[in-house]
Every structure is written in C-alpha cells, then in structure tokens.
C-alpha cells in the first residue's frame, strides 16, 4: 500500500479557504497527480483541504470521501510561555527553549499530559485520530496489532489524504511510533507538498510503514512557483522580512 499525505494549498486561515497562490498551487498539484495511480481519495472536512483536492478530483474524474478526523489537529488551550499568559491556538510552533527542556514532550504515550498543556481532551483528540486512521487502514486490509500492522489482504493500492500539517504529524507519529511534537517542531511540509509512505511486508502478514519522501514540492518548482513559507520561521533573526512569531 502507498499513502500520499498531502497538505492543503497556501491558506487563508480566516476564511478557511485558499489564497490566490494556494489556488495556483492546487492546480499545479493536480497536473502532477493526474499521472499518478490513485485508487481512493479522502479529504479533511475543512474548506482549505477540500478546495485543494477539487482540481485533482476534477482532473481524475474521482470523488473523495470527507472524514472529520482528518481536520486540523487544533488544540486551542495550550499554555505556551511565549503567549504571556494567553492560550495558544495550536500545540506546535514552540520556541525551542520552551519545549526541548520538557522530556515528556518526547514521549509518544504521555506528551499530551504535560502540565503546560491545558487542553483537557488532548489525549482523547489524539485517540480519535489514531482510531480513525486505523479504521481506514483496516478497511484497506491492514489491521493494527501493537506497534505494527497485520494483513491477510496485502495490496499495492494508493490512497491520498488531503489534510493539514499538524494532523499529518499526528498520522506520521502513529505510523512510525514516535511522539508528534518533534515532528511538528522539526519538519515543515509546505502547502500542497506530498509525503509518500509505503508499507513494508518483509515477513508474510506483518507490515510496517516507511516514509519514502517527505514534503515533496517538485510540482511547484517545475512551474516556477516558489513554495509558500507557511510552516517555517526566519532562517536568521536578522531576517526581519521573514516570520518570527
């Protein structure tokens, strides 16, 4: 099995839609995916993800199944120190000096229990994503068994998930068995980037997942479109024109 994890295009967060740049990116993505074999497409129920998927669906003559658990992983009551007493809207974009000193945030089973996190249902929210993903994979022949997957219906189907950066990190953390926060803090998936994940079945019936390519944006480069800076911060503090907070 192959999973294509696709982030939405350049976002207009206020209106949960795409910017003009994001719409261009979505059409460039479609021109790439038209030549890819994709068997099933699933989308977040948020506007920016569905708008990103639309050109691909039209180009391929396919329909997508919307899934609520693919919505952005937005825990909105996080007590990040840089918010000076206010509650942060997301559980990523931490300053390194605030999160790296808290070992529990590296723990895949307990990261959401840290007392700096005020979201009361964080664990339940993560569980909902895990269960949604495992139910989807079971429907495609791969049943979760501990930290790997059992299959008696192995296949080379390709499924595409049009979703979000934070949610994508939670998906990867579950498939790879690591905490999501180091992924959220250490990786940047540009808008319309494609992350490719394959199953590996080295022994019959026992499968795991491996990331073959993360955050690919070649469809933008071949069209002379610079990837959006979204999900990144300034390379140097002195770069005043780049995002600092």
Task: Locate predicted features.
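Phosphate-coordination/substrate-recognition cap region in phosphate-metabolizing enzymes
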Residues: 31-112
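Internal catalytic-core helix/loop-beta-alpha segment
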Residues: 114-148
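Short catalytic helix/loop segments, enriched in acidic residues and glycine
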Residues: 18-33
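Short glycine-rich phosphate-binding loop at a beta-alpha junction
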Residues: 39-45, 148, 158-161
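Acidic, low-complexity terminal tails and accessory targeting/binding regions
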Residues: 73-93, 147-158, 170-245
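Conserved beta-strand termini and adjacent loop/short-helix elements that scaffold enzyme active sites
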Residues: 6, 67-69, 212-214
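Extreme N-terminal starter segment of soluble prokaryotic enzymes
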Residues: 1-4
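Active-site metal-binding loops of divalent metal-dependent hydrolases
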Residues: 9, 165, 215-217
